[in-house]
Amino acid sequence: MASADKLINTDVPEKDVFAFHFLQSLSNLRKQNPFDTPDQKNYRVRKIKKAAYVSMARAAGGSSRLWSRALLRRADKDDNKIVRFSRRKWKISSKRRRSNQRAPVVEEAAERLRNLVPGGGGMETSKLMEETAHYIKCLSMQVKVMQCLVDGLSPK
């Protein structure tokens, strides 16, 4: 089996961190009991998906972005761990109140986007756009790293 260093040759530290955490999670999954029944295979698929998202959130800096905090919090909650939520109260600014008077089409699109981006529920539109751009960048990084892993590990 090829090493991760040979599979992912990059100068982007986020990719390296993602690859490290993702490969470590996959290794831990592999050490668990084999999954033979369809229910167990579905469980394994969910675990791999969760490992990919948690690795991506860690690579993004963990607590530096709202979406990464939301993903990590959701993962902790799924593991039945105690989750501490921020006690900070969010104020609705006058900008947000004014933004509610915008065209309904824009508001509907922003609301759909809030539902797609983890942790996007209470964000103002400008912050939502910033978080969405970073989230998309990290998702594309995740896809590229996973494609490198598949290309490097598949028989030629």
Curated annotation (Swiss-Prot):
**In this protein, which residues make up the domain named bHLH?**
90-139
Q: Can the keyword Transmembrane helix be found in this entry's annotation? A: no
What the record says about disrupting the gene is: No visible phenotype.
Question: What's an example Gene Ontology biological process for this entry?
Answer: gibberellic acid mediated signaling pathway
Database matches in PANTHER family: TRANSCRIPTION FACTOR IBH1, TRANSCRIPTION FACTOR IBH1-LIKE 1
Q: What family does this belong to? A: Belongs to the bHLH protein family.
Q: What is this protein called?
A: Transcription factor IBH1
Task: Supply the source organism for this entry.
Answer: Arabidopsis thaliana
The gene is IBH1
